[in-house]
Amino acid sequence: MYYCISFTHKNTDIALREKLSFSNEAKKSEFLKIISTHENIEECLVISTCNRVEIVAFVKMACAEFIVKSLALLCDVDKDILLEKADIFEDSGAIHHLFSVASSLDSLVVGETQIAGQLKDAFAFAVKNNFCGVHLSRAVHSAFKCAAKVRNETQISKNSISVASVAVAKAKELADLTQKKAVVIGAGEMGELVAKHLIAAGAKVIILNRDLQKAKDLCERLGVLSEYDSLENLKKYLNQYEFFFSATNAPNAIITNSLIEELSYKRYFFDIAVPRDIDINENENISVFAVDDLEIVVQKNLALREQEARMAYGIIGRETSEFFRYLNDLALMPIIKAIRLQAKEYADKQLEIALKKGYLKKSDKEEARKLIHQVFKAFLHTPTVNLKHLQGKMQSDTVINAMRYVFDLQNNLEGLNQYKCEFDMENNDEIY
């Protein structure tokens, strides 16, 4: 069954989320290796963003305690606290949750579009490292399909906002950004989003990054209203400008009290990284805003999009039901094919016996074959129709198992394509 353990802005604070975050691929790989050793876990992947850590798996039976214990040991967190905080979803609940995440209905900023790319990256990593198989491939592929439907059939992502845009909107409430210089620390996806929103607000941006070439490349994309420098010169910039937006993947804080000098004017720090980049004391001239502090702006966004969200949840509910109908169809179609194949094999075998014993002339072989095939097709028509009527119904599994036993189809099914998955697990072909 499908299984999901979720830690988000809804059930954990930023301090706990930053402990749980997978800031590098090595940590993610280590965790997935640990949990994939469990006998009940067949496939798994991890989605880790500034607002969530999601463990999505395909399992034989529930195993939340093992997964949470493994996460607690790796991240040095109390297991009981995690079990108390975790939202756990099983089977249809897990698929509904995954579809909601992919469609940005479960995001801190409803309608933001970053999560689709983050899910894509999480899936690609799991496939590349052999943690993900056909079951999660189906689920993620369907999640992308659902997200596309939500985007196309609702206005949920129209004028969509992100954590980056919310941070800049908050800065605009504090001061006029026109012609001001704002420092953006980090040249990754989030840093680029912040820079674009700042430029749109009339500001000029300075990109600081450890990899100078990456900062230069970003500035070339941004245009004349940007400049760049090395992160080594961070202290100089911290004590020269008013607005700072930090979005790095650093494992520990990079802006600390030791870098801050007392100045006569106000400075505003926006920390949109998890783990947090900023660990400084606030005073009358220094204000720090972390991801969770942007909740007020987010709530305004939710109110504006409430009607669209209801429509989107309707789509997600229907797509969840459709997904499980699809799974039932995959199970039924091989049964129908196997029965027809078995009938054809028996008919051909008896035809050859009849020819050998002289019951039938060789010249009549093809006509006899056509007649026999028409007979077994007519005979199997009603069973085939009845099986197809079971598609998507609860009793389908019971009937499938009975048919497999009655017709001894276990071996016959091995050669058939039971999955019809558009993702080739051997060649790592993309489905997104």
UniProtKB/Swiss-Prot annotation:
Annotated positions binding substrate: T49, C50, N51, R52, S107, E112, T113, Q114, Q118
Residues reported in the UniProt entry to bind NADP(+): G186, A187, G188, E189, M190, G191
Pathway linked to the protein: Porphyrin-containing compound metabolism; protoporphyrin-IX biosynthesis; 5-aminolevulinate from L-glutamyl-tRNA(Glu): step 1/2
Q: By its UniProt entry, which SUPFAM superfamilies does this protein fall under? A: Glutamyl tRNA-reductase catalytic, N-terminal domain, Glutamyl tRNA-reductase dimerization domain, NAD(P)-binding Rossmann-fold domains
Supply the InterPro entries for this chain.
4pyrrol_synth_GluRdtase (IPR000343), 4pyrrol_synth_GluRdtase_dimer (IPR015896), 4pyrrol_synth_GluRdtase_N (IPR015895), GluRdtase_CS (IPR018214), GluRdtase_dimer_dom_sf (IPR036453), GluRdtase_N_sf (IPR036343), NAD(P)-bd_dom_sf (IPR036291), Shikm_DH/Glu-tRNA_Rdtase (IPR006151)
Pfam families from the entry?
GlutR_dimer (PF00745), GlutR_N (PF05201), Shikimate_DH (PF01488)
Keywords for this protein: NADP, Oxidoreductase, Porphyrin biosynthesis
Q: Does the keyword Methyltransferase apply?
A: no
Q: Where is this site: Important for activity?
A: H97
Q: Which CDD domains match?
A: NAD_bind_Glutamyl_tRNA_reduct
Any idea which residues are catalytic in this one? Answer: C50
Q: Name one GO molecular function term.
A: NADP binding
Q: Supply the EC number(s).
A: 1.2.1.70
Role played: Catalyzes the NADPH-dependent reduction of glutamyl-tRNA(Glu) to glutamate 1-semialdehyde (GSA).
What is the name of this protein? Glutamyl-tRNA reductase
